[in-house]
Amino acid sequence: MPSVKVRVGEPIDRALRILKKKIDKEGILKTSKSHRFYDKPSVKKRAKSKAAAKYRGR
């Protein structure tokens, strides 16, 4: 779990920005979105092959 220590006199906006950057880096938000609903294995396989085709097209 990422945490940010806010120093005295440090703006809250900066601390929130740092926290958001840490969350993005660890991929917490992405995994929580993927676990939000159940995806059938066939749907996962189709999405994976579509992403691979998109990657190969570069």
From Swiss-Prot:
The keyword Ubl conjugation is assigned to this record: no
Recorded GO CC terms: ribonucleoprotein complex; ribosome
Regions of compositional bias (Basic residues) in chain numbering: 43-58
Chain segments carrying region Disordered: 37-58
Keywords from the UniProt entry: Ribonucleoprotein, Ribosomal protein
Gene Ontology biological-process annotations: translation
Keyword Ribosomal protein: yes
Single GO MF descriptor: structural constituent of ribosome
Name of the molecule in the record: Small ribosomal subunit protein bS21
Native organism: Chlamydia trachomatis serovar D (strain ATCC VR-885 / DSM 19411 / UW-3/Cx)
